[in-house]
Swiss-Prot record:
One of its GO terms (molecular function) is guanyl-nucleotide exchange factor activity. One of its GO terms (biological process) is protein import into nucleus. Involved in the Ran-GTPase system for nuclear protein import and poly(A)+ mRNA export. Gene3D superfamilies: Mog1/PsbP, alpha/beta/alpha sandwich. This is Nuclear import protein MOG1. GO terms for cellular component: nucleus. Belongs to the MOG1 family. InterPro entries: Mog1, Mog1/PsbP_a/b/a-sand. It is found in: Nucleus.
Length: 218
């Protein structure tokens, strides 16, 4: 499989600080997440119930695995998620950054540029495993279809898993488009509880990420 190299786009811009909160009653965390096979079974991790493989709906790049939320409003999963989140796993060539946090920022910059903005704020950052695994939660104002008048506040959980033996950076991103009410809450320096649920999901996806077949990187 051809692994594409991410390109350096922009520098992070510090915005106002928000507080990450968890107020979702009955949140059960990872209890209901299910194991999935990625890239033809070469990699495994977990995704929540109610998320479907986007390749069954549309074409997805070879380096990516995409899962979209297909839940309905009347369904109850008790995991803190809503109905509009999406998950992307991307295999990229390792960027020339020895510091893992700097490499993570590099990939975040690419993601935000794809969303039509260069301004983003890191809400939370964690080293999961020294030198190889880093996670964070960022917030941006994305321009839909490049139109500022359609701007939407988006929170993104971003994980970097560095597979040094394969010269590969695995980037997992979970997108959370905020409603107007949630965006208003965020502007008051608080985030909706589902952002915390997304971050817990991201960290579990990283913990349970396993390479099963190394020929994927041959």
């Amino acid at each position: 499989m051809k692994i594409e190299k991410a390109s350096h786009i922009s520098q992070p811009v510090q915005l106002s600080t928000c507080t990450l909160i968890d107020t979702y009653p009955g949140h059960q965390g990872s209890m209901n997440n299910k194991e999935v096979e990625l890239y033809g079974g070469a990699i495994t991790t977990v995704v929540p119930p109610g998320f479907i493989d986007a390749s069954t709906l549309r074409e997805v790049p070879d380096t990516q695995e995409v899962y979209v939320n297909s839940r309905r409003d009347e369904e109850e999963f008790e995991d803190g998620l809503a109905t509009n989140e999406s998950i992307i796993v991307d295999l990229l060539e390792t960027v020339d950054k020895s510091d893992l946090k700097e490499a993570w920022q590099f990939h975040v910059e690419d993601l935000t540029e794809l969303n039509g903005t260069t301004k983003w704020e890191a809400l939370q950052e964690d080293t999961v495993q020294q030198g190889t695994k880093f996670t964070g939660l960022v917030m941006e104002v994305a321009n839909k279809w490049g139109k500022p008048d359609l701007a939407q506040t988006v929170v993104i959980g971003v994980a970097l898993i560095r597979l040094t033996q394969f010269d590969t950076d695995v980037v997992i991103s979970i997108n959370v488009p905020l409603t107007k009410e949630e965006a208003s809450q965020a502007s008051n320096k608080e985030l909706p509880a589902r952002c915390h649920a997304v971050y817990q999901l991201l960290q579990e996806m990283v913990r349970k990420f396993h390479v099963v077949d190394t020929s994927l990187f041959a």
